[in-house]
Amino acid sequence: MARLPLKQFLADNPKKVLVLDGGQGTELENRGIKVANPVWSTIPFISESFWSDESSANRKIVKEMFNDFLNAGAEILMTTTYQTSYKSVSENTPIRTLSEYNNLLNRIVDFSRNCIGEDKYLIGCIGPWGAHICREFTGDYGAEPENIDFYQYFKPQLENFNKNDKLDLIGFETIPNIHELKAILSWDESILSRPFYIGLSVHEHGVLRDGTTMEEIAQVIKDLGDKINPNFSFLGINCVSFNQSPDILESLHQALPNMALLAYPNSGEVYDTEKKIWLPNSDKLNSWDTVVKQYISSGARIIGGCCRTSPKDIQEISAAVKKYT
């Protein structure tokens, strides 16, 4: 069955909450793909053998990941393009020209769409400016972040995604800096012509990684008023502390009660930097059932998982969404 445009679908179904997939990069790592490189989870797509050999091991792994998230209940899924800015790709892979770069993005989107089918929604994932210098978890964009040309950085990926009708939504993920947020919100329909969302990289204390409060973020949006791009569809939090995420989302909801929100936190596991392994967190306070219930009461329309969330987590999220909607 052909899918309705996403905004129309959610408008026609005001109580519907869509289940997002989970942490693709860490899930591919769990399945044996070595993602520890500057282009992160995009790495399997760089090899020509991924495209020329349908029986290649990495191709099978990526297809199985998508399939497992679908079987777990995901209704909206992402392209594996978080670290796929033109700058990152051209500086760290054999792909150099814009033509080669656009071919890579088109291939990834086509492959993702074929994996999930025509009835599910597909997000074109775009990581933050800070991802190419590993600053998405600090928000430290240097002494003069207001002078960074964010548009030139995002332009190649954004222009490609704008033109691709196989995408339903563009997702700016893990945005940690207020100047980057302001830049994205300043772009009109000539720059961002497809529905989009912004996922904020938020400290466990409830502020943007650069220290900006949720109230200050809300004021930026309120000040834009009717100048804001009508394609701005959702605001939310991602790659955030599992325990603190419900309170953070609620603070956004209180500040912007009419804004459609989304949430996809990390699993709650803790990374041991010495042993370089993920460990269960004895301080994990809540279950997915509890967290999802709180997200829904705070206006979330899309709920999923980020780092270390697996198909099992998405299955639990899906069950909770069905229970509370």
UniProtKB/Swiss-Prot annotation:
EC id: 2.1.1.10
A GO MF label: S-methylmethionine-homocysteine S-methyltransferase activity
Residue(s) carrying Phosphothreonine: T138
Places the protein is found: Cytoplasm; Nucleus
Inducers of expression: Up-regulated in response to high extracellular methionine.
Residue ranges of domain Hcy-binding in the record: 6-321
A biological process from GO: S-adenosylmethionine cycle
Keywords noted in UniProt: Amino-acid biosynthesis, Cytoplasm, Metal-binding, Methionine biosynthesis, Methyltransferase, Nucleus, Phosphoprotein, S-adenosyl-L-methionine, Transferase, Zinc
Known catalytic reactions: S-methyl-L-methionine + L-homocysteine = 2 L-methionine + H(+)
CC cofactor: Zn(2+)
Residues that coordinate or bind Zn(2+): C239, C306, C307
Broadest EC class assigned to this enzyme: transferase
SUPFAM superfamilies assigned to the protein according to its UniProt record, in alphabetical order: Homocysteine S-methyltransferase (SSF82282)
GO cellular component, one term: cytoplasm
Domain of life: Eukaryota
InterPro entries: HCY_dom (IPR003726), HCY_dom_sf (IPR036589)
Additional observations: Present with 60300 molecules/cell in log phase SD medium.
Function per UniProt: Homocysteine S-methyltransferase involved in the conversion of S-adenosylmethionine (AdoMet) to methionine to control the methionine/AdoMet ratio. Also converts S-methylmethionine (SMM) to methionine.
Protein name: Homocysteine S-methyltransferase 2
Gene source species: Saccharomyces cerevisiae (strain ATCC 204508 / S288c)
